[in-house]
Each structure stands twice: as C-alpha cells, then as structure tokens.
Amino acid sequence: MSEAPVLEDGFEFPGQSFSVAKADQVRKLTCSGIDPAIYGEAVDVAMLGLPTLRVLMACGLPILGGVHLSQRFRQKHAFLLEEEITISGRILEIAPHPRGCILKCAFEYARQDGTVCVEAVRSGISPIGPKEPSNGIPRPSEELDGFGEISR
C-alpha cells in the first residue's frame, strides 16, 4: 500500500481521464427539470463536478465532512458527450480553519489533443490538518465577466 501524498501549496494532482455519457447527462438534467435538448450533444459544465471530486478522493482527501465554499468554471470550448476528457489540477492554497483547512484548487479539463476547454477554481473546508483559528473565509470575486445564459 502506498503512502498518502504530502498535500501542500503547489501540489499537483495526478491526471485522470473520463467521459460524460449521454444517458447520464440526460438523466441528471431531466431529474433537475432541465430540458436536455438545451445542451444537444454538448456536455453541461456542471457534469465536471463529480470527476473533480474523484481526483481529490484519489489523493486521500476526504469528501465526507467537507464543506463546499465556491466553485467557478470558465468554459472556453464545449466538450461533446462521450468525448474523452483529461483533468489535471493543483493546490493553490491551504489555509487554517477550526474544522481542518480551507483548500483552494485549480483544475483544467482538456481534450485528448491537449486543448484546454474548461478551467475551474474551487474551494472548500476539508477536515484535514491541524484545526486552527482562521482569519475568516475569503469570498470569491463576484465579477460576472464572461457569463452568459444558454438560449432556451
């Protein structure tokens, strides 16, 4: 059994590949009251959330007991359903918190040719590390540049 990696600022998560199955996206969108036809053959960027959590879990980061603080996706190009996607990421910052630490990470989602289609920054309270007082939880920027509604 291998030793858990030392997690610190700059740590790079091992890359993983996955694809979003059309049936999964249709089921989840329908369950949420969203017409899957809005996305056609494109992947809804929200479908990238679970694979991101899998990257964290593969490095021994507990998901249970964590508190999601923020997540922002920047989509440059749409992925197609069933297309192979490679995710890579790194830790930007680890800050103390009474419940463990505030973990801020950046991720890139790329096509097989290396084209980065989506970038994400997420933060959350993770129940790891010394439980120390914090200087407050930093709020993400509320800048809305680049946001647009998908036509319905």
Q: For the regions a protein language model found, what residue spans apply to each?
A:
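HotDog/MaoC-like acyl-thioester-processing domains
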Residues: 1, 77-152
